[in-house]
Amino acid sequence: MADSERLSAPGCWLACTSFSRTKKGILLFAEIILCLVILICFSASTSAYSSLSVIEMIFAAVLFVFYMCDLHSKISFINWPWTDFFRSLIAAILYLITSIVVLVEGRGSSKIVAGVLGLLATLLFGYDAYITFPLKQQRHTAAPTDPTDGP
């Protein structure tokens, strides 16, 4: 039994890490890192805005783990494309609003850096929402128009 577990371990590791090399995996990892950097900048200046970064970092990390371990295919009662789309769309809108508020206040260099990084996060989350839009991915083939009956 130990031999079969040992033999399946590299395959399991390969399956788990193969998602991190995809476009979506790199995008989610970049979102996690950017949220962490924004959290550090907000914590250095004002902690009032840091909750957005914490929540979005947790959501992105949870989805990253679910996609990486292929848990999204095992949990079928959640519509994962729509969940990911709404997560990234709401994050883009909230980061845009928060960044504008922080840049208008503009007191302190860490707030300005956090505001600019928040605008960058808006673009990143907006791009994520664009590429994960579920209706864009569904392609329908045209129905045949030739008559099936003879001449």
Swiss-Prot record:
Its subcellular locations are:
Membrane
PANTHER family associated with the record? MARVEL-CONTAINING POTENTIAL LIPID RAFT-ASSOCIATED PROTEIN, PROTEOLIPID PROTEIN 2
Q: Where are the transmembrane segments?
A: 25-45, 48-68, 85-105, 112-132
- Main subcellular location of this protein, as a coarse class: membrane
Keyword Transmembrane helix carried by entry? yes
Q: Which residues form the MARVEL domain?
A: 19-137
InterPro entries named in the record? Marvel, MARVEL-CKLF_proteins
This entry's Gene Ontology molecular function terms read:
chemokine binding
Its lineage reads: Eukaryota, Metazoa, Chordata, Craniata, Vertebrata
Q: What's the stated role of this polypeptide?
A: May play a role in cell differentiation in the intestinal epithelium.
Quote the cellular component terms of the Gene Ontology held in the record. Answer: membrane; plasma membrane
- Mind telling me what this protein is named? Proteolipid protein 2
Q: Tell me which UniProt keywords the record has, alphabetically.
A: Membrane, Transmembrane, Transmembrane helix
Topology in the lipid bilayer: Multi-pass membrane protein
